[in-house]
Amino acid sequence: MLGVLELLLLGAAWLAGPARGQNETEPIVLEGKCLVVCDSNPTSDPTGTALGISVRSGSAKVAFSAIRSTNHEPSEMSNRTMIIYFDQVLVNIGNNFDSERSTFIAPRKGIYSFNFHVVKVYNRQTIQVSLMLNGWPVISAFAGDQDVTREAASNGVLIQMEKGDRAYLKLERGNLMGGWKYSTFSGFLVFPL
């Protein structure tokens, strides 16, 4: 004979009904519940994907956006390294953008999206700005019109990064004497690999 507790559990399970999708290929969604999956054929797959399960968590979110909010000319540090520094971080989800060095450090292997917009102000020189990955240029952008007071070098790219890889902007040609207010540098993890 079934005990009272067992009857209550059976009744609750019957009322809740089965967790199901519309068809066999649709995932089962159990909102607010923990689902434990056991593999009857375990392997030594270190990635944990032997079952074909992809797990996303809040810690997988990675994004940053930094701007230049003042029109100060480059500092001694900028003149020496030619790295383009940003003085205000608007978004830094995951804390992977080092604001002191204006460098993004990849927290995991994945595909990342970057874009930049570097404004030159009252400067008749052509500038070349490059997105650097571990010290090597990936993409560049140019601004060289001598008849305008403000012009921007802009570009964007998707790149594969390994954990610990560093991305930053470098002034490869010209100077930013006059400042670079309104310049931006942003990036985010598109998906992990």
UniProtKB/Swiss-Prot annotation:
Annotated signal sequence is 1-21
What outcome is documented for mutating Y122A in this protein?
Abolishes GRID2 interaction
List, alphabetically, the SMART domains matched: C1Q
Give the consequence of mutating R124A.
Abolishes GRID2 interaction
- Keyword Cell cycle carried by entry: no
Q: Which InterPro entries match?
A: C1q_dom (IPR001073), Cerebellin_Synaptic_Org (IPR050822), Tumour_necrosis_fac-like_dom (IPR008983)
Q: In which tissues is it expressed?
A: In the Purkinje cells postsynaptic structures. In the cerebellum, cerebellin is much less abundant than [des-Ser1]-cerebellin.
| Post-translational modification, as annotated | The proteolytic processing to yield cerebellin seems to occur either prior to the secretion by presynaptic neurons and subsequent oligomerization or in some other location after release of the mature protein. Sialoglycoprotein.
Q: Name one GO molecular function term.
A: identical protein binding
Positions of the UniProt region annotated as Essential for interaction with GRID2:
122-147
Q: Where is it mainly found?
A: secreted
One Pfam match, given by its short name, reads: C1q
Instruction: Give the UniProt subcellular location, in the record's own words.
Output: Secreted; Postsynaptic cell membrane
A single GO BP: synapse assembly
GO CC annotation terms, alphabetical: collagen-containing extracellular matrix; extracellular region; glutamatergic synapse; parallel fiber to Purkinje cell synapse; postsynaptic membrane; synaptic cleft; trans-synaptic protein complex
What keywords appear on the UniProt entry?
Cell membrane, Disulfide bond, Glycoprotein, Membrane, Postsynaptic cell membrane, Secreted, Sialic acid, Signal, Synapse
Where do the segments described as Necessary for interaction with CBLN3, and homotrimerization lie? 62-193
Glycosylation annotated at which residues? N23, N79
Assembly: Homohexamer; disulfide-linked homotrimers. The trimers associate via N-terminal cysteine residues to form disulfide-linked hexamers. May form oligomers with CBLN2, CBLN3 AND CBLN4 prior to secretion. Once secreted, does not interact with other CBLN family members. Interacts with GRID1. Interacts with NRXN1 and NRXN2 long (alpha) and short (beta) isoforms produced by alternative promoter usage. Competes with NLGN1 for NRXN1-binding. Weakly interacts with NRXN3 short isoform and not at all with NRXN3 long isoform.
Functionally, this protein is described as follows: Required for synapse integrity and synaptic plasticity. During cerebellar synapse formation, essential for the matching and maintenance of pre- and post-synaptic elements at parallel fiber-Purkinje cell synapses, the establishment of the proper pattern of climbing fiber-Purkinje cell innervation, and induction of long-term depression at parallel fiber-Purkinje cell synapses. Plays a role as a synaptic organizer that acts bidirectionally on both pre- and post-synaptic components. The cerebellin peptide exerts neuromodulatory functions. Directly stimulates norepinephrine release via the adenylate cyclase/PKA-dependent signaling pathway; and indirectly enhances adrenocortical secretion in vivo, through a paracrine mechanism involving medullary catecholamine release.
* PANTHER family per record: CEREBELLIN-1 (PTHR22923:SF5), CEREBELLIN-RELATED (PTHR22923)
What is this protein identified as? Cerebellin-1
Q: Which organism is it from?
A: Homo sapiens
| Lineage of the species this protein comes from | Eukaryota, Metazoa, Chordata, Craniata, Vertebrata
